[in-house]
């Protein structure tokens, strides 16, 4: 043993080492506290690097994880956190951590130290910001909390050194290894909490299902003819009960055939105006001139054929409710006239000068995208805000499938009463009906039930007797017409078509680019079947994802109308997601 080896460390060296150990201990204490209180440990890594920089002068911290865990052959790290680097999110991970270093740590699973990255891996391997100063890189593996043999990521930091490489010590490796261990424990604890939470939620779902099965099916919600037990229809009924007692205008929105007039009558029946009149006007069925006369009335002699004074619908609905169906179809010129009576409750008859005041509650309905119409200048924004005080969205029948059977039974009972018959549906017939999508909603369901009952040979309708089992489903035929596959002359006799499942055709083989097509006509002039035939399922899904699954926004992205988007959703059997 030499004298130098046996010589004890000097007091100054021991003091310096003691201070370094104390700083390392303090740093680990702060890091442990941070991880213990963090709901997301990875999100706290930048703060951890700040602690290492403040206490131990370890700068330029980097945490990189595998982009595709489990694929050892293709190590593809991406940086989660990188402090003290001027780096854009789009910059590659190699800007802060050399790829060669990441591969070494991922594959070996042991710490790595480099005093001169440029000498070992080339000048290009060194981050640009660190090329002008001596830097020691310390990188340690971050292991999967549940598979210790699998390296999940790399935790690295840089320390500046002089030409003698002073400043670095084995303590740096030990500290970073302990930080990685603390992060692993925090991740393990977080995963355990997530699993326990999921297990508790699953137990709760099972208990609720058991209780529901023991209680039996919920009683159908019935409110002035509204039938259903689904959560979607229950929410609509609850909204109607909340707003019916107020004087606020209600806007009913939904697809065609969802029963908007029925819900409008429910609003009226639940309101204090229930004993007053309920007057309905279909705004789409009348021209602008006739609509003005119908709503406001006219004086005798106001125009040719006005042989007597006629009260308008606003007057007739005084003290009650006026239902303006298809309000989205009125012309921009008439919208200003309607706005005045909605704002002030007064108007003049056509050809008259006397101002008439009324107390009428407005319930409007539309299946149009009014927001899109406002953006296009087709619908006045001030009128939109006046009628859309309480919007109620009526769910399509495909989103309330548990209501199909009670509704079908209601229509069957009504058919029997009207025709003095006693037709019943077999269980398999009900099952078949409940599997259908019904793009025409409740109106199509009623058509299906009445058709099956009218054409039935006996007292019981079997599944085989339904139109969809005989290749004569009306909604399926509509889809074939849009796709251009319907045979000329009508329905395809003998072809079995099930409208509940529609499989899209495989994409065609790539073909040479066609000749430039002539300029397309305006969007309103493009037939539905042309647009939907040109649209692919993937294009529709991409547009819906970009639009947050809002049909109106997706329609604008694709240059289509919301109605065309609705047909495309039915065509490709895509269910809307709630975000």
From Swiss-Prot:
> What Pfam families does the database record attribute to this sequence?
GAF_2, HTH_8, Sigma54_activat
Enumerate composition-biased segments (Pro residues): 505-520
Which GO biological process categories is it annotated with? nitrogen fixation; phosphorelay signal transduction system
Q: Region (C-terminal DNA-binding domain): which ranges?
A: 537-579
Keyword list, A-Z? Activator, ATP-binding, DNA-binding, Metal-binding, Nitrogen fixation, Nucleotide-binding, Repeat, Transcription, Transcription regulation, Two-component regulatory system
GO MF entries = ATP binding; ATP hydrolysis activity; DNA-binding transcription factor activity; metal ion binding; sequence-specific DNA binding
Q: Where is this region: Inter-domain linker?
A: 464-536
- So where does a divalent metal cation get bound? 468, 473
Q: Where is the Sigma-54 factor interaction domain?
A: 226-454
- Give the matching SUPFAM superfamilies: GAF domain-like, Homeodomain-like, P-loop containing nucleoside triphosphate hydrolases
Q: Which residues bind DNA?
A: 551-570
* List of residues binding ATP: 254-261, 317-326
Annotated sequence repeat ranges: 505-506, 507-508, 509-510, 511-512, 513-514, 515-516, 517-518
* PROSITE patterns, per database record: SIGMA54_INTERACT_1, SIGMA54_INTERACT_2, SIGMA54_INTERACT_3, SIGMA54_INTERACT_4
Q: Which residues form the GAF domain?
A: 40-187
Region feature (7 X 2 AA tandem repeats of X-P): 505-518
Ranges for the region named Disordered are: 502-529
- Subunit architecture: Interacts with sigma-54.
Describe the function of this protein.
Answer: Required for activation of most nif operons, which are directly involved in nitrogen fixation.
Q: What is this protein called?
A: Nif-specific regulatory protein
Q: Which gene encodes it?
A: nifA1
């Amino acid at each position: 043993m030499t004298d130098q080896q046996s010589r004890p460390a000097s007091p100054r060296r021991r003091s310096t080492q003691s201070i370094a150990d104390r700083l390392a201990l303090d740093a680990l204490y702060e890091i442990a506290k941070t991880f213990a209180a963090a709901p997301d440990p990875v999100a706290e890594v930048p703060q951890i690097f700040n602690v290492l920089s403040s206490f131990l002068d370890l700068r330029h911290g980097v945490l990189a994880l595998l982009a595709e865990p489990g694929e050892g052959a293709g190590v593809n790290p991406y940086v989660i956190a990188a402090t003290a680097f001027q780096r854009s999110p789009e910059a590659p991970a190699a800007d802060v951590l050399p790829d060669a270093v990441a591969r070494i740590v991922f594959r070996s699973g042991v710490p790595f130290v480099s005093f001169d990255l440029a000498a070992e891996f080339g000048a290009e391997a060194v981050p640009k910001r660190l090329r002008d100063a001596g830097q020691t890189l310390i990188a340690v593996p971050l292991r999967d909390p549940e598979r210790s043999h699998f390296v999940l990521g790399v935790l690295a930091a840089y320390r500046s050194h002089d030409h003698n490489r002073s400043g670095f010590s084995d303590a740096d490796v030990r500290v970073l290894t302990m930080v990685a261990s603390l992060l692993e424990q925090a991740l393990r604890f977080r995963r355990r909490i997530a699993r326990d939470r999921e297990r508790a939620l699953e137990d709760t779902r099972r208990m609720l299902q058991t209780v529901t099965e023991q209680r039996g099916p919920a009683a159908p919600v019935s409110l002035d003819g509204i039938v259903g037990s689904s959560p979607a229809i229950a929410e609509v009924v609850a909204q109607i009960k909340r707003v019916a007692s107020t004087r606020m205008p209600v806007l009913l929105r939904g697809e065609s055939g969802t029963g908007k007039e029925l819900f409008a009558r429910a609003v009226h029946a639940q309101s204090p105006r229930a004993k007053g009149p309920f007057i309905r006007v279909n705004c789409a069925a009348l021209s602008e001139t006739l609509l003005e006369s119908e709503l406001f009335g006219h004086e005798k002699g106001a125009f040719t054929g006005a042989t007597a004074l006629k009260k308008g619908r606003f007057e007739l609905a005084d003290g009650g409710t006026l239902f303006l169906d298809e309000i989205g179809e009125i012309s921009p010129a008439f919208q200003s006239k309607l706005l005045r009576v909605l704002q002030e409750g007064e108007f003049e008859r056509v050809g008259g000068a006397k101002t008439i005041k009324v107390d009428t509650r407005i319930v409007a309905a539309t299946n149009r995208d009014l927001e899109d119409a406002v953006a296009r200048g087709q619908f006045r924004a001030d009128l939109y805000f006046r009628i859309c005080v309480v919007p109620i969205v009526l769910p399509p029948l495909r989103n309330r499938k548990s209501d199909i059977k009670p509704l079908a039974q209601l229509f069957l009972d009504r058919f029997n009463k009207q025709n003095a018959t006693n037709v019943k549906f077999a269980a398999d017939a009900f099952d078949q009906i409940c599997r259908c999508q019904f793009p025409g909603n409740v109106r199509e369901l009623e058509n299906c039930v009445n058709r099956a009952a009218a054409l039935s040979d006996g007292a019981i309708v079997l599944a085989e007797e339904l139109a969809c089992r005989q290749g004569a489903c009306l909604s399926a035929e509509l889809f074939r017409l849009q796709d251009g596959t319907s045979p000329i002359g009508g329905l395809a006799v003998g072809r079995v078509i099930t409208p509940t499942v529609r499989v899209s055709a495989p994409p065609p083989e790539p073909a040479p680019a066609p000749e430039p097509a002539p300029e397309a006509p305006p969007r309103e002039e493009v037939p539905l079947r042309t647009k939907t035939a040109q649209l692919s399922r993937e294009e529709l899904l991409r547009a819906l994802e970009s639009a947050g699954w809002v049909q109106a926004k997706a329609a604008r992205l694709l240059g289509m109308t919301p109605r065309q988007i609705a047909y495309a959703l039915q065509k490709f059997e895509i269910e809307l997601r709630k975000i």
